[in-house]
C-alpha cells in the first residue's frame, strides 16, 4: 500500500516555517504581561497536547505584533526543536499565539492535508529520522535546515483526507475518555 506513496523532503510540502526561537520580551523592548496573547514554548507541547498551562506566559498587543511577524494559523503544525525534542501539536484554533522558546511553526501547502502530515510526523519512522538528524550530547536539538530535509511519504490527497479523518476521530475519542477518567 505505502509503496505507491510519494516520498519527498518536508521543505517541498511546506509553505512557511515560522521560527522565532530566541526572541524574548526584553530583546524586543517589552515585558511579560498578566494577560493578552499566550506564549507557548517547547515545555508546553507534549504528545499532541498543550500541557503545563500554568507555565504559559502572556504578551500584550504591541509585543505580539513585534514578535509574530508571521502568525500561527489554524492548520499549522507546531514542533519542538529541543528540550523536549520532536514533540508535535496540530493548531486547530483561530486563537492568536506567540511561538516562544524552542518551537517551530510549519504551514503546509494547500495541496497536502496538513492534519495527515501532522500524523505522519508522529510516526516512528519520521521520529527516528528526526533523532538521526539531531545534534548535541547534553541537550539534543534539531536545526531548522535538518528538519526540512526529513522525508515525508504521502498518498494521493483523497487518501490523505481519509487517513487524517480516521486519526482525528480516534483523537477525539481519546480526549472524551480522558475527560471521563478525570471526572471519576
Predicted regions and their residues:
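Residues marking the start of alpha-helices
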Residues: 1, 28, 55, 63, ...
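Short glycine-enriched loops at secondary-structure junctions
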Residues: 45-46, 83-85, 135-136
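Sequence-specific dsDNA recognition surfaces
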Residues: 7-30, 43-74
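A generic secondary-structure signal marking the coil-to-beta-strand transition
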Residues: 6, 35-38, 55, 102
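Non-catalytic DNA-recognition/assembly elements of restriction-modification systems
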Residues: 1-23, 149-183
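A short beta-sheet element
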Residues: 41-42, 58-126, 143
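A short glycine-rich beta-alpha junction/loop motif
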Residues: 81, 97-104, 115, 135-164
